[in-house]
Amino acid sequence: MTDASGSERLKRAKGISEGTPSSLPDHLIRATAAEGKIRVVGLVATQAVQEARERHKLSYVATVALGRAMSAALLLAANLKRRQARINLQLKGNGPLGNIWVDAGLDGTVRGYVSNPAIELPLTAESKLDVGQAVGRYGYLHVLRDLGYGQPYTSAVELVSGEVGDDITYYLSSSEQIPSAVLLGVNLDSQRVRAAGGVLLQLMPGAPASLIPEMEARLAKVEEFSPMLACGGGLRELLQLCLGDLDLKIAPEMRTIRFYCKCNSDRVKGALRMLGRDELLDMIHTDKGAEAVCQFCNEVYRISEDELRSIVAEMSATP
């Protein structure tokens, strides 16, 4: 943003507010409702989204878009079976934000980035951040499921709105053929993310289709759930508000959520080896070293000239 008036308008936007940020730890919980006919997953990912915002220097609208995608990927990953299983989301729309990439695991780890993190757009007529316009109304949502064994499973659907939640709901109903209702939210102020998270309701096999509009209506009751989290409301309390009179049973287990990237200097050095001896020698003579930036976490790795020479020596010694 380039002027104070623009900043003030953004502060007044729905989803942006000033005040004390939520101190709730990032976590995921599971539950059932309607006598076990509805599967429920809810999560808080405030610190994870804040770390993504800081690492990538995200604008307001980029923070909300990536935060929604991170929460969505974590919700989908929660239904995987093996601890090493992971979900990859790619939203490739025609908007100025470019592409969104997110990687999340059953273990609660998540990372992600956007192509154009600094982009900002005018607010909508309802004074909301225009995530759909930033992502784009036309394009595709790609979902890769790595189950931890065999070949990963990939599917794609057209974007419905670019708002992320609608697109995930459409993917689940059309590709996975699971009637679902998804609620995603990010609440932030000029300093930090105050609350972020999501709720996923899914019909269990054999459940009556009449429960589908019921699920949608229940989530509509807590449409502004991220501001509620930001004001100190707990995730369990929010689920009680949404489903408390529908035989809600919350599992006692709670899974920790955190931003985590598996990049490290050894991986960077391994990637440099792939460039070949001649390319590395050119780096030594021209650049006196090498620099690499991880796209997912924006971590900068600097490989010294001596380290490059060691890599070349190892390559030369290998038959």
From Swiss-Prot:
Database matches in Gene3D superfamilies: Hsp33 domain, HSP33 redox switch-like
Where in or outside the cell it occurs: the entry states: Cytoplasm
Location of the region described as Disordered in the Swiss-Prot/TrEMBL record: 1-25
Output the PTM entry: Under oxidizing conditions two disulfide bonds are formed involving the reactive cysteines. Under reducing conditions zinc is bound to the reactive cysteines and the protein is inactive.
Sample GO molecular function, one term: protein folding chaperone
Domain of life (superkingdom): Bacteria
Q: Which residues form a coiled coil?
A: none
GO CC terms, sorted: cytoplasm
Compositional bias of kind Basic and acidic residues: 1-10
The cross-references to SUPFAM superfamilies, in alphabetical order and at most eight, read: Hsp33 domain (SSF64397), HSP33 redox switch-like (SSF118352)
- Keywords attached to this entry: Chaperone, Cytoplasm, Disulfide bond, Redox-active center, Zinc
Which Pfam families does this UniProt record tie to the protein? Answer: HSP33
Q: Kindly list the biological process annotations in GO that this record carries.
A: protein refolding
Q: List the disulfide bonds.
A: 261-263, 294-297
> Function of this protein?
Redox regulated molecular chaperone. Protects both thermally unfolding and oxidatively damaged proteins from irreversible aggregation. Plays an important role in the bacterial defense system toward oxidative stress.
HAMAP family the UniProt entry points to? HslO (MF_00117)
Checking NCBIfam families in the record gives: PRK00114.1 (NF001033)
Q: Hey, which family's this protein in? A: Belongs to the HSP33 family.
Descriptive protein name: 33 kDa chaperonin
Annotated source species: Synechococcus sp. (strain JA-2-3B'a(2-13))
Protein's gene: hslO
